[in-house]
Amino acid sequence: MLNKSFIVGAVSLCGLLGAGLVSQSALAATAAAPDLVAKYDKDSDQTLDLAEVKAAASAHFDKLDKNADGTLDAKEVQGVIGPQTFKAADPDNDGTLSKDEYLALVAKLFNKADTDHDGTLSAQELKSKTAHALKRLID
Protein backbone atom coordinates (compact mmCIF):
# COMPACT_ATOMS: atom_id res chain seq x y z
CA MET A 1 0.00 0.00 0.00
CA LEU A 2 2.71 2.47 0.94
CA ASN A 3 4.56 1.83 -2.30
CA LYS A 4 1.40 2.36 -4.35
CA SER A 5 0.65 5.63 -2.53
CA PHE A 6 4.22 6.77 -3.01
CA ILE A 7 4.10 6.05 -6.74
CA VAL A 8 0.76 7.84 -7.17
CA GLY A 9 2.14 10.83 -5.26
CA ALA A 10 5.34 10.90 -7.30
CA VAL A 11 3.41 10.73 -10.57
CA SER A 12 1.12 13.54 -9.40
CA LEU A 13 4.10 15.65 -8.42
CA CYS A 14 5.68 15.12 -11.84
CA GLY A 15 2.44 16.25 -13.46
CA LEU A 16 2.36 19.39 -11.34
CA LEU A 17 6.00 20.16 -12.09
CA GLY A 18 5.40 19.63 -15.79
CA ALA A 19 2.43 21.99 -15.68
CA GLY A 20 4.61 24.53 -13.90
CA LEU A 21 7.21 24.35 -16.65
CA VAL A 22 4.59 24.93 -19.31
CA SER A 23 3.23 27.86 -17.34
CA GLN A 24 6.71 29.34 -16.95
CA SER A 25 7.31 29.03 -20.68
CA ALA A 26 3.98 30.69 -21.42
CA LEU A 27 4.77 33.46 -18.94
CA ALA A 28 8.17 34.03 -20.53
CA ALA A 29 6.61 34.33 -24.00
CA THR A 30 3.98 36.73 -22.66
CA ALA A 31 6.59 38.90 -20.96
CA ALA A 32 8.83 38.95 -24.05
CA ALA A 33 6.12 40.13 -26.48
CA PRO A 34 6.16 43.86 -25.58
CA ASP A 35 9.97 43.86 -25.48
CA LEU A 36 10.13 42.35 -28.95
CA VAL A 37 7.76 44.98 -30.34
CA ALA A 38 9.67 47.80 -28.64
CA LYS A 39 12.99 46.51 -29.97
CA TYR A 40 12.06 45.92 -33.63
CA ASP A 41 9.02 48.15 -34.32
CA LYS A 42 10.76 50.70 -36.55
CA ASP A 43 7.59 52.54 -37.61
CA SER A 44 6.21 52.80 -34.02
CA ASP A 45 2.82 51.28 -34.86
CA GLN A 46 2.97 48.86 -31.88
CA THR A 47 3.13 45.84 -34.21
CA LEU A 48 5.79 44.03 -36.22
CA ASP A 49 5.38 43.68 -39.96
CA LEU A 50 7.22 41.14 -42.09
CA ALA A 51 9.82 43.67 -43.26
CA GLU A 52 10.71 44.54 -39.65
CA VAL A 53 10.92 40.88 -38.70
CA LYS A 54 13.01 39.98 -41.76
CA ALA A 55 15.42 42.86 -41.05
CA ALA A 56 15.90 41.57 -37.50
CA ALA A 57 16.23 37.99 -38.76
CA SER A 58 18.83 39.00 -41.35
CA ALA A 59 20.96 40.66 -38.67
CA HIS A 60 20.52 37.62 -36.40
CA PHE A 61 21.56 35.31 -39.27
CA ASP A 62 24.79 37.30 -39.61
CA LYS A 63 25.47 36.90 -35.86
CA LEU A 64 24.83 33.16 -36.02
CA ASP A 65 27.10 32.72 -39.07
CA LYS A 66 30.26 32.34 -36.97
CA ASN A 67 32.50 31.34 -39.87
CA ALA A 68 31.08 34.08 -42.14
CA ASP A 69 30.54 31.73 -45.07
CA GLY A 70 27.04 33.04 -45.81
CA THR A 71 25.32 29.86 -44.66
CA LEU A 72 24.32 28.30 -41.38
CA ASP A 73 25.07 24.69 -40.57
CA ALA A 74 23.34 22.64 -37.87
CA LYS A 75 26.04 23.48 -35.32
CA GLU A 76 25.63 27.24 -35.85
CA VAL A 77 21.88 27.06 -35.22
CA GLN A 78 21.97 24.58 -32.35
CA GLY A 79 19.43 25.74 -29.78
CA VAL A 80 17.81 28.06 -32.32
CA ILE A 81 16.39 25.61 -34.87
CA GLY A 82 15.62 21.98 -34.12
CA PRO A 83 16.89 19.22 -36.43
CA GLN A 84 13.51 18.53 -38.07
CA THR A 85 12.83 22.21 -38.71
CA PHE A 86 16.36 22.63 -40.06
CA LYS A 87 15.85 19.76 -42.49
CA ALA A 88 12.48 21.13 -43.62
CA ALA A 89 13.99 24.61 -44.13
CA ASP A 90 16.79 23.18 -46.30
CA PRO A 91 15.00 22.38 -49.59
CA ASP A 92 18.22 21.73 -51.53
CA ASN A 93 19.36 19.28 -48.83
CA ASP A 94 22.91 20.62 -48.76
CA GLY A 95 23.06 20.55 -44.95
CA THR A 96 23.17 24.33 -44.63
CA LEU A 97 20.70 27.20 -44.66
CA SER A 98 21.37 30.13 -46.94
CA LYS A 99 20.08 33.51 -45.83
CA ASP A 100 17.20 33.13 -48.31
CA GLU A 101 16.25 29.74 -46.83
CA TYR A 102 16.49 31.17 -43.31
CA LEU A 103 14.31 34.15 -44.23
CA ALA A 104 11.79 31.83 -45.91
CA LEU A 105 11.48 29.97 -42.60
CA VAL A 106 11.04 33.31 -40.82
CA ALA A 107 8.28 34.29 -43.27
CA LYS A 108 6.54 30.94 -42.82
CA LEU A 109 6.51 31.31 -39.03
CA PHE A 110 5.45 34.96 -39.30
CA ASN A 111 2.47 34.04 -41.48
CA LYS A 112 1.47 31.24 -39.12
CA ALA A 113 1.70 33.56 -36.09
CA ASP A 114 -0.33 36.27 -37.88
CA THR A 115 -3.65 34.74 -36.87
CA ASP A 116 -5.80 37.69 -37.98
CA HIS A 117 -3.96 37.83 -41.34
CA ASP A 118 -3.47 41.61 -41.25
CA GLY A 119 0.21 41.41 -42.20
CA THR A 120 1.44 42.40 -38.74
CA LEU A 121 2.11 40.71 -35.41
CA SER A 122 0.55 42.35 -32.38
CA ALA A 123 1.82 41.87 -28.85
CA GLN A 124 -1.02 39.37 -28.38
CA GLU A 125 -0.02 37.36 -31.46
CA LEU A 126 3.59 37.37 -30.24
CA LYS A 127 2.50 35.34 -27.21
CA SER A 128 1.86 32.20 -29.26
CA LYS A 129 4.07 29.12 -29.44
CA THR A 130 4.76 29.85 -33.11
CA ALA A 131 5.82 33.40 -32.30
CA HIS A 132 8.12 32.06 -29.59
CA ALA A 133 9.85 29.94 -32.25
CA LEU A 134 10.01 33.00 -34.50
CA LYS A 135 11.60 35.03 -31.70
CA ARG A 136 14.52 32.58 -31.58
CA LEU A 137 15.17 33.32 -35.27
CA ILE A 138 15.26 37.08 -34.87
CA ASP A 139 16.60 37.78 -31.40
Language model: regions and residue ranges:
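Acidic carboxylate motifs that coordinate Ca2+ or other divalent cations, activating on Asp/Glu
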Residues: D41-D45, D65-D69, D90-D94, D114-D118, ...
